A protein has these predicted regions:
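Glycine-rich phosphate/pyrophosphate-binding loops
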Residues: 32-44, 193-206, 227-241, 452-455, ...
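Small-residue-rich helix-loop
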Residues: 327-429
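Active-site cores that bind ATP or allylic diphosphates and position pyrophosphate for catalysis
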Residues: 97, 105-236, 242-248, 256, ...
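Conserved phosphate-binding loops in nucleotide/dinucleotide-binding enzymes
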Residues: 81-85, 183-184, 202-214, 241-273, ...
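Residue-level signal for inorganic ion chemistry
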Residues: 27, 58, 98, 102, ...
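Charged substrate- and nucleic-acid-binding regions of tRNA-handling and nucleotidyl-transfer enzymes
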Residues: 416-477
């Protein structure tokens, strides 16, 4: 049985877009599920869109997310070079061969002539003008050094038919296709040509890419057939949408992998969520490690319908991953965000991390969740009103001085001791402990929702700061 070989072939034009990451992930999962190889190829034929440093970002994004490729520019392999700009001679060799086979031809048309083909609706389709040049005329113009491109010779009529492993039988009228350029005037190949040559020479068995290539695939098949090569199997993936009407777009700066990492999403969670954008595992399992995905991956679970990117679901999933981290691992992940916050250098960061663990969905929200630690913010006294705990401003005004007195008597300001001591004091007083802790929380944080309860926060703040904040809140209540 033929060994499965898939590839991810991104253009180095910026950050790793989530759509590209999903293509890489599915290509990786399909190859590894079937005991095959996953190859990285850099498609840098469009030099005008090349972004410095983008290739290194591709390497780091793939390796950082666990998608380890078996062959590629930086790891080598038997089918290199794996960068298209280093394969120009190969493309020219096959372009000339395709011309000999009648599948392509030289085109010398000027920019002005091409523009004259534009109709009243702004559409332009090449009219095969140079297809009819004699061999002698072509050789004369080449010898004279005239600029040229090489175009594919698409049949003027008939229907192309091929099978896609997701969408089934695809039919495209040749009349709807244009004699697209294969080799540009600067000598560089276009994607339409290079991907066919490379996929064949690199032994790619399954081509996995987005549905935007469904209508272009007949052009590629014409070249496979002209060369007498076996066509690869095609797996086209559904579009990822930003919302009901707009696609996620790399060109417009939408969701990229590095942005989410910087926001504080764990790479494992991002990969897990991206896997679900178009694929539903059996039993509707949502949380999976990469090895589990490899084991479960099946084309049967891939949808034909577009999927909508939902950052709230990513946040939920990321929160699940954060809660599974050990205390030390969470601290290591949280530390860069704690160091950027106002608490740095003033409080015990390990205690803050312990307070936050399991109470954040992504690490980037840490600074805003702890800004109250530095100083008590001004707050609305209506926060003391709580039916469940039977408190209001008047109850707080009466009870807070007693809470302060109780705290003054306590030397051990650890969470456990504070909780036990205050619960006993509340019982002796004949009030609900919930009332005591609610009033205390508002008084020392100015917030109804905090990462941690009143006694956890008091331990973090320490006795002196806790009592100072209670004094400040008493001042608010007695104005």
């Amino acid at each position: 049985m033929e060994k499965v070989r898939t590839r991810f072939a991104p253009s180095p034009t910026g950050f790793m877009h989530l759509g590209g990451l999903r293509t890489a992930l599915y290509a990786y999962l399909y190859a590894k599920h079937n005991g095959g190889d996953f190859i990285l190829r850099i498609e840098d034929t469009d030099q005008q869109r090349y972004v410095e440093g983008a290739v290194e970002l591709i390497y780091s994004s793939l390796k950082g997310s666990g998608l380890i490729y078996d062959e590629g520019p930086d790891v080598g392999g038997n089918y290199g070079p794996y960068v298209q700009s280093e394969r120009k001679e190969i493309y020219h060799k096959y372009a000339k061969k395709l011309i000999e086979l009648g599948g392509a031809y030289y085109c010398f048309c000027s920019k002005e002539r091409l523009e004259s083909l534009t109709d009243e609706n702004g559409n332009r389709k090449y009219d095969k003008h140079c297809l009819h040049l004699s061999k002698e005329e072509v050789e004369r113009r080449l010898a004279a050094g005239e600029p040229y491109v090489i175009r594919q010779n698409i049949p003027s009529e008939g229907v192309s038919e091929y099978e896609d492993m997701i969408y089934g039988t695809i039919r495209v009228d040749y009349a709807d296709l244009e004699d697209n350029i294969l080799i540009k005037s600067d000598g560089m190949p276009t994607y339409n040509f290079a991907n066919v040559i490379d996929d064949h020479l690199m032994g790619i068995t399954h081509v996995i890419r987005g549905t935007e290539y469904l209508s272009s695939t007949p052009k590629y098949n014409l070249m496979y057939d002209a060369f007498g090569w076996e066509r690869p199997k095609y797996i086209h993936l559904p579009t990822i949408m930003k919302d009901a009407t707009r696609k996620l777009s790399k060109r417009y700066g939408d969701a990229n992998f590095d942005d989410f990492v910087k926001k504080g999403y764990l790479k494992e969670a991002i990969i897990n969520y991206v896997a679900l954008l178009g694929w539903t595992p059996k039993d509707n399992i949502e949380k999976m490690t990469l090895p589990e995905m490899v084991k479960m991956f099946s084309l049967d679970g891939i949808s034909k319908s577009p999927s909508i990117f939902d950052e709230m679901k990513l946040r939920w999933l990321n929160g699940e991953y954060i809660r599974e981290l050990s205390e030390d691992d969470f601290y290591a992940h949280a530390l860069p965000y704690l160091e950027k916050s106002a608490v740095y250098g003033k409080f015990d960061l390990k205690k803050i991390a312990k307070l936050l663990h399991g109470r954040v969905e992504f690490l980037g929200e840490i600074p805003e969740k702890i800004d109250w630690i530095v100083s008590l913010p001004e707050y609305d006294l209506a926060l003391f009103d709580n039916k469940k705990n039977k408190t209001d401003r008047e109850v707080a005004k009466a009870l807070l001085p007693e809470i302060k007195a109780w705290l003054e008597e306590i030397d051990d300001f650890s969470n456990d001791n504070l909780f036990t001591a205050l619960s006993e004091k509340a019982k002796e007083k004949g009030v609900k402990s919930g009332s005591v802790f609610w009033i205390m929380r508002i008084a020392i944080t100015g917030m109804a929702v905090t990462p941690g309860g009143a006694t956890e926060i008091a331990e973090l703040l320490g006795k002196t700061e806790t009592l100072a904040r209670i004094d400040k809140s008493l001042g608010y209540l007695t104005k």
